Amino acid sequence: MKLQNFFIITALLFTLQSCIKSEAPNAEADILTCEVDGNLLIREPIIQNTEVKLYVTDLDKVKNLAPRFTLTQGATISPTSGTARNFSTPQTYVVTSEDGNWQKTYKVSCLTNEIIAHYHFENARITDGYYTFYDTSVSGQEIAWSSGNAGFKFTNSNAKPDEFPTSQSESGYRGKCVKLVTQSTGVLGKTFGAPIAAGNLFTGSFEIDLFTPAKSTHFGIPFKRKPTHLSGYYKYKAGEKLTDKKGNVIPNQKDKCDIYAVFYEVTSQVPHLDGTNIKTHNNIVLMAQLTDKRETDNWVQFSIPFKTIKGRSIDTKKLKEGKYSLAIVLSSSEKGADFTAAVGSTLYVDEMQLSYE
């Protein structure tokens, strides 16, 4: 039996290696770093698969901005690195691999710390085969939510949009809502030590880390105000069997959902928090945590206060400089980052609101 398992895992790894090799040219068309002159940025640029986000102090100063990029070896970019452009609206760049066979289009956006405090979950688009949620500010600035859907696609490439852990439902408290479902990641997910994927939605970004999956979630976006409450509506049903990371059933226990928010200081050593430290890191100053996690067939209203972590406080100077981040996190399984969860656990959330000073 052990020998048979060895051959199965070997075959899976060989298949995965073949997939990676076949897509390697595309990996040679990446933006690695981005720089701009002066003190315009309040945070290091956030570079995702096809997007670069630049958090800036003033949008009036981006009308003649000339960002410089470093690329994967031999790749070229159009327009060329250092070209001055008007970033009052997002700009597009095309990166071409060294052999000329692969191209990747990037959207580069300049964002301010404009606050969006009402989340209706009406706005979602299908990107790369799965739902992506976003909100739009009064001025038209778009802020995207993140999820682990990209990781699920890696293990379940044939899934339809509604079969991903994070999707949109028509059955909201008012209109549409976000639907989060804990899913099995199949044989390939188990191979990498990630047998389940909890449905999640959070402020921040998601970058796949195959070796430490819990570090794939980069929680938080810049926030220059003091948050006081997070409120909204939820419905929740736990899956039938709670299992651990190895797939063993945990008797006499049920899964629970999780809704919480964390306000923390950002430093050069701690640019973000992830699934390994989002509730425990010493940089956390304020935290709001849902404690009433009961299962319910009807919508339940919640309002959770931000509480100060003992011995910590907000530095007003750093707050004005944008040195704090706010992470709002929704999950269908509270221990999903540790892969202890029940397949089928389902959380609906709607009409959420952030209050602040």
Describe the role of every protein-language-model region:
Residues 111-156:
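Extracellular carbohydrate-recognition regions
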Residues 19-120:
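Beta-rich interaction/scaffold domains
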Residues 168-188:
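Short carbohydrate-recognition loop motifs
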Residues 188-269:
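Extracellular-facing segments of soluble proteins and assemblies that are Gly/Ser/Thr-biased and enriched
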Residues 268-319, 342:
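Extracellular carbohydrate recognition and processing domains
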Residues 249-260, 301-346, 352:
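Extracellular beta-strand ligand-recognition surfaces/modules
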Residues 1-30:
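Bacterial Sec-dependent N-terminal signal peptides
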Residues 122-123, 266-281, 314, 333-357:
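Extracellular polysaccharide-targeting segments
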